[in-house]
């Protein structure tokens, strides 16, 4: 039986909004405008969370700045998916002790997935005394009252509720782009892959109600947003906890029929919950980009079982082949882990052969990183680091060759793009499949859809000319 999502009551959110007003009044009484810096690590969900943090800070009277130097409030939104990300966070948080020494009144907060791990919170308490506050993803909506408490008392605060999570609607947002927007449709994950810390720190799956999502998307379209991405740890599970008979494909179809000129994307998916219905929906509606990020992680059944992925190589390939059969221009991307505990050379070769079979447009490749508290962290791992690095390099070489071959096939073709900025002397744009295109043009094209003819390519990007 699916759990019903816990929705934060409107009166509680109104209380937080009132606190924002009180903080704003406090700074007005001091005769100056405070500044805040938000630093984000990790995935797109963290980016979306940081936009809400910036929204609450702006509602509290803060000017959002792009450096920690001289900021009155610093918020670091952390990532726990790999050891490298955590190491960077610890290093940067440690360096802030010098920044705070120059600005003693500065308030420093840590949030995000690392703060969902008790051992991390204890380390922050004991070894990073210059940090004023900590809150985990479930407590994000309470940030105004946490900030107010620290401002009033100068006492450290740790809000690390261990609940299964919640949903808070109507939190103010300061988006990082006026062209592209993230829309969280659900939070948490129920899958418990053996290597992944996310379900432990993000909680169980909770879906937003479809009418709330539609209202947000309508507002974005009205504001001129052209590229909208629906976010969730596993969007394919959307709606299962609501009991409304609305699944992810239904939600996508409803959004795709809204008036306006925009592209609709989504991430991330889990293959065990992907369906032909979803592929059919993508194929049916022009506004849904012909792009599917479908992480396979390994091409070997024994490794997939050890990862607790709940699908086989054959089941995955059937999905990928079906998508390409009904949409020959479908852009397929994926995640893959190299060096999972116990992976043999033959099992690694199964991963290589799957990549050759599917011919992904791009891969996000990682060497296995053990996460404390996950089953995989306790597995015997006899493969030397040097061997893992060799396999990683070989896999990247294979994928880079395939990516270049696919890009070479675009030369001479005309594609639709959305121009998103300038890089030195060239404009940059993205195809609906997310490919980077560089071309000469005027800045007036930024934010517009138009056609370009591809004249050249590299492994990672295309070069084009305006039609």
Q: Predicted segments — roles?
A:
Residues 105-110, 118-119, 222-345:
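Conserved SAM/AdoMet-binding glycine-rich loop
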